Amino acid sequence: MAAPQGGYPPQEGYGQPGDYGSPTQQQPGVVAGAAHQGHAGGKKKRAYAGEAFGFGSGANAALGGQPPAGGSYGVYPPQPQAAGYQQPVYGADPHQMNAAAPGYATPASPGVAQMTQQFGAMGMTDPHLMPPQPQQAAVTPQAPRPVPLNQLYPTDLLTQPFNVAELDYPPPPIVLPPGTSVYPSPQANCPPTYVRSTLNAVPTTHSLLKKSKLPFALVIQPYAALHDAEDPIQVIPDQVISRCRRCRSYINPFVTFMDHGHRWRCNMCNLTNDVPQAFDWDSALQKPADRSLRPDLNHAVVEFVAPQEYMVRPPQPLVYLFLIDVSYASVTNGLLATSARCIKESLDRIPNADRRTRLGFIAVDSSLHYFSIPRDGSENSDPRMLVVSDLEEPFLPIPGDLLVTLSECRENIETFLDKLQEMFQNTQNNGCAMGSALRAGYKLISPVGGKMTVLSSSLPNIGHGALTMREDKKVLGTSKESSLLQTANSFYKSFAVECSKAQVSVDMFLFSSQYQDVASLSNLPRYTGGQTYFYPGWNAARPEDAIKFAREFSEYLSSEIGLEAVLRVRATTGLRMNTFYGNFFNRSSDLCAFPAFPRDQAYVVEVAIDETVTKPVVCLQTAVLHTTCNGERRIRVLTLALPTTQNLADVYASADQQAIATYFSHKAVERALSSGLEPAREALQAKAVELLSTYRKELAGGSVSGGGLQFPANLRGLPVLFLALIKNLGLRKSAQIPTDMRSAALCLLSTLPLPLLMQYIYPKMYSLHDMPDNAGLPDEQTGEIVLPPPVNLSSERIVPYGLYLIDDGQTQFLWVGRDAVPQLLLDVFGLADRTQLRVGKQNLPELDNDFNQRVRAVIEKSRDHRSKGVGSIVVPHLYVVKEDGEPGLRLWAQTMLVEDRADQSVSLVQWMGSLREKV
C-alpha cells in the first residue's frame, strides 16, 4: 500500500497538522527550491511520523548537501549548533545549503589565507576532503616550487569538528614529480588498498621526522580478498625476474633504463644492473616483446611465478589437521555436530586444484582419538579410531593413514564426519588435553607443514599446556587486570615458535561459555601467522549462532592461503625497517615468517630514517614469497613511491590519519600486553596532546587564536579516533569486561585490515527511518547498494522515533526508538504492536514492502567486505535493541556511541576540552 503524498496523518504527539513539508514550513537554512526538489520524484512515499519539518535537519540532512527527499521517515528538529557538533559542509552545492560554515575559510597564514578564502567562497574545501577522486589526479601548482605537495588546511577542532563522513575519504594524494615512473601508467604506484603510509610526504632527515612527532610506518595488506578471483592482479608467468644485485629489490615502475635499455638503475640503492636477456622476449608467442607493456614496469602490484631457486624444498601439499574438542561441553553446546557437518558441506570448497590437499582429524577429551580413514573403494570403508591416553609423550599409532588425500578418500571422509557425532554423543568426559593434542598434531604434520585448526569449547585442563581458571572478578578494572591478559603458561609461546620453524600454522576457533584463557591460547596464532576467532556463549541450539559459525567456517576453509611464506620490506638507501607488528614470527631483523599466509589480516612496519635522503622520491617495496594452494611458488611485490620534503607543513598536510590510527592501535596493544591497560591509554592521550602541541608551536605560530584547537583538516579525525581507541572493548577502563572478551578484542586491534579496524574503533551508524530515497537500492552506475550517509556516534543524533543501524564490523545493532510509530514496526518487523517486538540476536523477516527490502539491503551491504577492499570471513550478528527494552543489551549498544560519556570514560566534548587545556 502506498502512503498518501503528505505522509500519514500525524500521530498523537508527532508533528502538527498542516502542509507536510511545504515551503512555508521550511527548516531554517534550507532553500525553498530544495524543498520542491524533494517531491519532484513523483513517487509515492511512506513517512514514519516526524516533527512537521519537511526536510532536513535529520541525521542524513547535512551531508553532501542533499536533503532527504520526499516525506522522509521521520525527521527531527534542527540541531542546536552546539560547540562540538556543528556540521561542516563538505564540498556542498552552495545553492542547496546555507553557507553557514563555508568549508575551511579560516585564515592560516597571509600566503594561504587568500587562497583558502577563495576555496571557501567557491564552496570548495580541502582537495582530499572532497568526495573520492582518482588517485593519480594532477595537482595544479600553487606556488613556485619544484613540485607543490598537498596544501595545509588548518581547522579549529572546536568550531569545525570531525564529521564521520571523512573516514570514507581517500588518504591525501601522493604527489610525485612528473616522469617519476619509467612509463606513464596510472597503476604505477601502489593503491592504498594494499599499502598505506602514515606520511605521504617523507621527511628527508631523522631530525625533521622527530620534530614532527608523527610516526613513519607502512600499513601493509598484501591481499584485498579471500579469493584470487575477487583480487585480480597482474601475474608474470615467464619466470624472468630481474633483481638488483646489491639490495635484491625487484624491478619496478620506478627504475631508470640506461645504455640503450641494456641496463637499469635501481631506484633503491642506485646500483646499475644488466637487463636479463629474456626480459624483452615473449616465451609464449616465441617472439620479441614490447618492453613498455611488461606488467612489472607498469603495475605497482604484481605477482611473479618463481623459478626453482626460490624454493627451499619442492612445494608441499595443502594440509588441514582438525583438532576437535569432544568433551562434554563441546558435545552439549552442539560444537561437535555443527563443525563435523560444516566440514562435510565445505569439502568441495577447500582449495584442491592440484588434487594433493590432505586432511586429518584428532578428537580431544582427556585422551587423544586418532582416526584412520581408508581410501574410497577399499574393502573396509569404516574409519578406525585409535585412542592414546599417555598425554606426556603422545605417540602416533600409524602415521600413514592419519593424513589422507581428500581426492582419494572423499566418500570415506564424509562417512567419518557423519559418524563422528555419534561416537561421542553420550560422553560425560570433562577433560580437555588440547595442549597434548597440539603436540601430537605437530608430530603428524611437521614433515610437510600445514594448518592445525582447533575447535574447542573448553579450557585445556590436562596434559601439556594445562591452564587454570584464573579470572577473578575482583581484579577486573584494577591495575592487576593486565596480568590476566598475559600468557599463563610458557608452553603456548615456545610451542608456537617450534611450529613456525616447521611451517605449521595454528588457527583457534573458541566457543566457551566459561573462561577459556584466550590470552594464552591466542599466542599460537600470533606467532604462526594464524588467527583467533572467538564465539562467546555460543550454542548451536540458537539458529543464529549455528548459521553464523557455519558461514564463517566455510569461508575460512575455502580461502586461498599462501604456504611457507616470508615477507620482507626493502626501501631507498637511508630508510630502514625498524619494527614489525602483526601475527607472524620475526625470524631476523627484517624477515617475517608465515607458515601460512592469511588473507584477512594487515601488518604494520615502522620505518626509521638513518641517513639524510637526497632524492626527491623514496620507494618502499614489500615482497611476499609464498607457495599458492595449488603448489606454485610465487612472489607478490608491492611498490610504493613517496615524495620527500624538508618542510614540516608538507609532512603534516600529507599525513594519513587512518594509517596513523592503525599504527597506534598496534602500539597500544603492545603496550597493554607489556605494561598494562592504564599505561596504554595514557600513552594514547599523551600522543594526542603531543601532536596538537607540536602543530600549534611549529605550524600555527604558537597562537591560541581565540581559544581554539588548531589541527590540519586531513588529521581532524585523529583525536576522535584516539578517544574511540581508548574506549574500545580491548582498552577501555571498566570492571565489567570479561578477560576473554578483552583478549579477543586485542587480537582484532592488532590484525584487522585498515578499513575494518577503523570501523571496529569508530563504528558506522546509519539513520534508517529518514534515509534518502536512493539508499538501500542499487546505484544506477555501479549496481552496488547505496548506503545512507553515516552519522556521528553521539546520542544527540538519535531521535526517540528513529530506527538506526550501528555496525562495528563484528556486531550489528538495530536500534528501535521508544516512540517508533506503528507503521514503521509493521513495515520493518511485520508486527502490529511494539510489545511483540523481541530483542536480541535475530534476522529481519523478509516482508513484501519496499522499506523492509531497503533496510535489509542496507544491513547486508554494511556487512559487505569486498566493497571495502578487504578479505574477511566474519558475518556479524544482528541484535535488535529497544531503547526502553532489556537494559544490558541497551548498554552494550550504547558503548558503540563513542562520542558519549559512559561507564568510566569521558565524552568527546570533555575529551576535546581536556586536550585543549593540556595543549
Swiss-Prot record:
Record GO terms (molecular function): SNARE binding; zinc ion binding
Keyword Metal-binding set for record: yes
GO aspect biological process, one term: COPII-coated vesicle cargo loading
Cell compartment(s), UniProt: Cytoplasm; Cytoplasmic vesicle, COPII-coated vesicle membrane; Endoplasmic reticulum membrane; Golgi apparatus membrane
Region (Disordered): 1-45
Membrane topology: Peripheral membrane protein
Zinc finger-like: annotated span: 244-269
Main location: cytoplasm
Compositional bias annotation for Low complexity: 1-38
CDD domains reported for this sequence: Sec24-like
Keywords for the protein's UniProt record, in alphabetical order: Cytoplasm, Cytoplasmic vesicle, Endoplasmic reticulum, ER-Golgi transport, Golgi apparatus, Membrane, Metal-binding, Protein transport, Transport, Zinc
SS bonds (residue pairs): none
Residues that bind Zn(2+): C244, C247, C266, C269
Gene Ontology cellular-component terms listed: cis-Golgi network; COPII vesicle coat; endoplasmic reticulum exit site; endoplasmic reticulum membrane; equatorial cell cortex; Golgi membrane
Highest taxon of the lineage: Eukaryota
Family: Belongs to the SEC23/SEC24 family. SEC24 subfamily.
Subunit: The COPII coat is composed of at least 5 proteins: the sec23/24 complex, the sec13/31 complex, and the protein sar1. Golgi apparatus membrane; Peripheral membrane protein; Cytoplasmic side.
Biological role: Component of the coat protein complex II (COPII) which promotes the formation of transport vesicles from the endoplasmic reticulum (ER). The coat has two main functions, the physical deformation of the endoplasmic reticulum membrane into vesicles and the selection of cargo molecules.
Protein name in the entry: Protein transport protein sec24
